[in-house]
Each structure stands twice: as C-alpha cells, then as structure tokens.
From Swiss-Prot:
Name of the protein this chain belongs to: Imidazoleglycerol-phosphate dehydratase
Assigned GO CC terms: cytoplasm
Pfam families: IGPD (PF00475)
A single BP term in Gene Ontology: L-histidine biosynthetic process
Primary location: cytoplasm
Keywords linked to the UniProt accession: Amino-acid biosynthesis, Cytoplasm, Histidine biosynthesis, Lyase
Gene3D superfamilies: Imidazole glycerol phosphate dehydratase, domain 1
Record pathway: Amino-acid biosynthesis; L-histidine biosynthesis; L-histidine from 5-phospho-alpha-D-ribose 1-diphosphate: step 6/9
UniProt organism field: Ralstonia nicotianae (strain ATCC BAA-1114 / GMI1000) (Ralstonia solanacearum)
Recorded superkingdom: Bacteria
EC number: 4.2.1.19
Phylogenetic placement of the source organism: Bacteria, Pseudomonadati, Pseudomonadota, Betaproteobacteria, Burkholderiales
Amino acid sequence: MSRRAEVTRNTSETQIRVALDLDGTGKQTLNTGVPFLDHMLDQIARHGMVDLDVTATGDTHIDDHHTVEDVGITLGQAVAKAIGDKKGIVRYGHSYVPLDEALSRVVIDFSGRPGLEFHVPFTRARVGSFDVDLSIEFFRGFVNHAGVTLHIDNLRGVNAHHQIETVFKAFGRALRMAVEIDPRAAGTIPSTKGAL
C-alpha cells in the first residue's frame, strides 16, 4: 500500500507544493524561501522518516508569515491524503527530544478533531531573521488540515533555536510513531467508534 501524496496550494500570497512518502527514509528537497523553515522541515523529514519535497514562493518581501503558515497547511493536507482512511495506524504518537539545555515533548492523535495546545516560552523573539511566533502558525495550519490533536510543550530551554528545534524533532518522531502500521490492527480503524 502506497502512502504517498502530492498537494499544491496556490493563493494570491503563496504558491506551495508538498510531496511526501510516509514510509520513506527521511530524504528531503526543501526550498521554501525561508531558510530556517527549511532547516525545521529537514528535522521533520529526518526524524519522522518521511520523504519530503517542499517548494514554495511567497510574499516574503512583506514577511515570512504567509509562507510558513501555508506550508503548514499544505503539509497537513498532504499527510491527511497520504494516510487515507487511517486503517491499521497506531494513531497516537509521542516523543521527548533534548538538545543541550532544551527539552520538548510532543504528543499527536490522528483523531479527526483539529486541536492545538502550544506551550513554548520563547526566550527571544527571533532566531536570526525568523520570527519565533511563526512556529505556532505553522503547527496551527498543519493541525487544522491534517485533522489531528497536537500537544506541544517545551519543558525547558534557554536558547530559542534549541527550543524550536527540539519541538520540530519531537514532532517528526511523534508523527512517525502515530502513522506506523500496527500489524496486529491491520485493516481496522483505531477507535471504539469505528471511525475517525
């Protein structure tokens, strides 16, 4: 069973293309026009073992907001498309990831109910030119279009780069766990309702 998807999103602000393979090896080709976002998408691909190809052009002459948010939206749509009816998936995933002084926890549920709890007490407003608030916009876009519940907690950290990077690495690992096929649950929906 192939769990690949390709989604494009074209608006007056951005043009986004995301292609992915949930059963990949972490290969990636990333060109969003926002270098720090490319760095974070690399974390998702490598730690989630998702092959990821993302290209984006956007109104970055204004700021990076629309590009970052729309990449999150398009990635969410692609994951939802690739995962299909969710039969046989583990459904839940979680991960703790440290990076030096920083530690983050991410928990995901492919519930079909979009919800985001994002608790990251950033220690500064920017990492290089990247506005740290855009990380929540990325995950909000993802959650609303993948149909997942996502809890993100940075438990400690002093360096804002480390805070964000641990979040994206933990997200990749939690995603990998949740979308794995459980051989004991082949062909069944992981819910007592029989639907997600």
